[in-house]
Regions:
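N-terminal Rossmann-like dinucleotide-binding module
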Residues: 1-61
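A general structural signal for well-ordered alpha-helical segments in protein cores
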Residues: 28, 32, 44, 54, ...
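C-terminal helix-rich "cap/oligomerization" subdomain common to oxidoreductases
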Residues: 1-15, 81-83, 119, 305-346
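Beta-loop-alpha module in the N-terminal Rossmann-like domain of NAD(P)-dependent dehydrogenases
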Residues: 61-123
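NAD(P)-dinucleotide binding in Rossmann-like oxidoreductases
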Residues: 215-222, 231-302, 319
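Rossmann-fold dehydrogenase core element
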Residues: 119-137, 157-161
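Hydrophobic residues in well-ordered beta-strands that form the structural core
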Residues: 27, 67, 84, 106-107, ...
Length: 346
């Protein structure tokens, strides 16, 4: 009797071994622990210019190797991919160095100090053939997949307006976000979130933008900002701040309804998320529907999706071209705040 053929199953993907550049708070408190919870993203090394910090972080997190220089980690043959959470002005130089060593790179947002600098990183990616992406972790969260599906289904009719806000309070003079030469300021740090979300949801680039910024008189970084983006299909408004109460929200308005995203950007890994859908017909502004999403670690999901792209499955969640588009908008907003005119992203 002939043997029955066994069903074909895809072999498991080979894990991507990660090295971490720097012992930044986001790396030590969020990204490394998240990656360590996935078999796809083992963290094998961490580097700091202060070897003591690298060893302390490695010991605390159970990372096998600690290096006292970024070069040593990048040149480690057992590292497949680099996570780069260094200060903003070091994103592109060290990402290029890693790419030239044959390492894939997941670089923290904002990717660069300008769109022109982002183009340099695109050139390095194209020369080396490695995968490089920007770390907008919220794009991996299931709530945003649901929002995009609702928009595709026409649940709110035609999307016409995206309104976003992200702020926190931080006046620490030692914080890298308060150093202008290092790419500090609220627009670069948190204003980039509602901007990238609006571009992602509209699926197009803004034709022109206008913005207003208020600067801290001591640190000389923008501490409060707002802007308007005009797209071919609609508009987006945003506000951001680094010296106002912590808050985040995104609202989408269409011709037939709206969607309210309660915690759009940085929900805690143990915190469930909700979106609200209003068809505009409920009396007194009552929300017609609430959709809940179980708690997930979006940093883990981000690492897994990027690693899958490295292994040829799927694509990098936020491409360099997408990141460059976001920087072009931010560049134009800085110009607009000075010129007090509408500016065209370029």
């Amino acid at each position: 009797m002939p043997k029955r053929a066994q069903p074909f199953t895809e072999p498991p993907l080979v894990p991507v071994r990660w090295g971490i550049l720097g012992a930044a708070h986001i790396a030590v408190s969020k990204v490394i622990p998240a990656m360590q919870r996935s078999a796809m993203t083992p963290v094998v090394a961490i580097a700091s210019r202060d070897i003591g910090k690298a060893r302390a972080a490695a010991r605390e997190l159970g990372v096998a190797r600690a290096y006292g220089s970024y070069e040593e980690l990048i040149d480690d043959p057992d590292v497949d991919a680099i996570y780069n959470p260094l200060p903003n002005h070091l994103h592109v130089p060290w990402s290029i160095r890693a790419a030239e060593a044959g390492k894939h790179v997941l670089c923290e947002k904002p990717l660069s100090l300008s769109a022109a600098e982002a183009r340099q990183l695109i050139g390095a990616r194209d020369r080396t053939g490695v995968q490089i992406g920007e770390a907008f972790m919220m794009r991996a969260h299931p709530q945003w997949a649901a929002v995009r599906e609702l928009l595709a289904e026409g649940r709110v009719g035609e999307l016409k307006l995206v309104a976003g806000h992200f702020s926190y309070f931080r006046r620490d003079p030692t914080d890298v976000r308060n150093v202008p030469e290092w790419g500090g300021g609220a627009l670069m740090d948190v204003g980039c979130y509602p901007i990238t979300i609006a571009r992602w949801l509209f699926g197009e680039e803004p034709l022109e933008v206008t913005g207003m910024l208020e600067y801290d008189p001591v640190y000389n970084v923008d501490r409060l900002g707002s802007g308007l983006l005009r797209f071919p299909s609609g508009q987006a408004t945003f506000s951001s701040g680094s010296q106002v109460v912590h808050y985040q929200r995104v609202q989408l308005f269409g011709t037939e309804g709206r969607i309210d995203v309660e915690i759009p950007f940085s929900p805690a890994a143990d915190h469930a998320c909700r979106i609200f859908i209003d068809d505009g017909l409920a009396l007194g502004g009552a929300l017609a529907e609430e959709v809940q999403f179980p708690a997930v670690d979006q940093y883990r999901l981000q690492g897994e999706r990027f690693s899958e792209a490295v292994r040829g499955v799927g694509h990098v969640p936020t491409t360099l071209e997408d990141a460059m588009g976001n920087m072009a908008v931010i560049d134009a907003l800085f110009r607009s705040a000075k010129s007090r005119r509408w500016e065209v992203p370029e």
